[in-house]
Structures are given as C-alpha cells and as structure tokens.
C-alpha cells in the first residue's frame, strides 16, 4: 500500500510563490517585481540579481543543482535548456553555486530544431527564452535529482513566437489594452 498524505499539506511546496517571495526578497525588490508582473515597469538587472539569488538559494534548499528555462515550443511538447548552478571550483576545491539575474531573465537555446528553424542558417535559427515572471518558478523532482524550472516564453531573434505561450501573453496584452480603451470611452 502506498504512503498516505494530505494533499493540502504538500500542495505548492515546490513553487516559488508569492508567500516565498515575500519571505525571501527585500520589500523594495518584491514591490518592483509585483509592478513588473502587473506590466507597470521593467525589472532592473539589480533587482533581477536579487531575485535570482533568492530563487537559487530556495531551490538549492529543495535539492536542486541545476536550473532550466522551461517552455512549450510549437511542437506540442515541453522543452528545456538546462544549466548548472555550479561554477568553477575555488582554490580550496569547493564549488561556487551561482545564478545571476541575467541568467534568470534570458537564455539562448538553439532554435534550429523547432518549426521553421531548420529552414534558416544556424545563426538565424537562434531562439531566445525570456522569463515570464507572471508564472511562478518551481522545483521539479525526478530520478536524477531536482531542477529549478523557470517558465519562459520562446521567440526567434526576429521576435517571431516559437512557443505556445508568447501568443497567449500577447493576446492578453491586446485584450487588456482594448478593454481599458472601452472603459475610458464609457467614462471610467
């Protein structure tokens, strides 16, 4: 018989959610991240560095040694680009565990294997992942260990959507813009 547990007790325990962010981020960085999530402002690299460090520390506590920019390409499956928190060993032989805001915000996987990628020269087939801060990061546990999964959008270097998330994010922005326009016309 399998082990029994209360789902309510474990639900979301591997999600870098709002509660975790409030606990681990300085108040001003948390506030700036929330404003970024609402589309009011862009996130500064300094704030991204603080968020990345807090996210890394939390993920390491959960057993993660790697992170991945996780996305849904047009192939209908999920895709991941893995990197390690572990950097070159120090002179004493111990490793550094690092994760920068730049690494959090943007990745550069090869897009040549995705739809229309093979039709272009390799340098033109570049794809970029961009962190979607409106979707929470999470730790996925597996047989090979734990990995911090960072939800991202995936676009070509020309801005063409190469995933299923980017069109949804763009349509949400368009609907929001038009809804606000209509409300203003109605006097609100």
Regions inferred by a protein language model and the residue ranges of each:
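Histidine/acidic residue-rich metal-binding segments in metalloenzymes
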Residues: 2-100, 105-122
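Glycine-rich, acidic/polar active-site loops that bind/position phosphate-bearing ligands
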Residues: 124-188
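Polar low-complexity intrinsically disordered regions
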Residues: 1-2, 188
């Amino acid at each position: 018989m399998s082990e029994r547990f209360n789902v309510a007790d474990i639900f979301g325990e591997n999600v870098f959610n709002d509660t975790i962010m409030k606990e681990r981020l300085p108040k001003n960085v948390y506030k700036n991240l929330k404003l970024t999530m609402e589309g009011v402002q862009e996130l500064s690299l300094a704030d991204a560095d603080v968020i990345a460090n807090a996210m890394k520390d939390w993920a390491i506590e959960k057993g993660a040694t790697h992170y991945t920019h996780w996305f849904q390409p047009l192939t209908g499956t999920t895709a991941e680009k893995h990197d390690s928190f572990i950097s070159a060993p120090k002179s004493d032989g111990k490793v550094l565990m690092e994760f920068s805001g730049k690494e959090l915000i943007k990745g550069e996987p090869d897009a040549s294997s995705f739809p229309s990628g093979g039709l272009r020269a390799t340098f033109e087939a570049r794809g970029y992942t961009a962190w979607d801060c409106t979707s929470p990061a999470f730790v996925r546990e597996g047989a090979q260990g734990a990995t911090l999964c960072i939800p991202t959008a995936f676009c070509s270097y020309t801005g063409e959507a190469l995933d299923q998330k980017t069109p949804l994010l763009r349509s949400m922005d368009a609907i929001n813009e038009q809804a606000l326009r209509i409300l203003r016309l109605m006097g609100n």
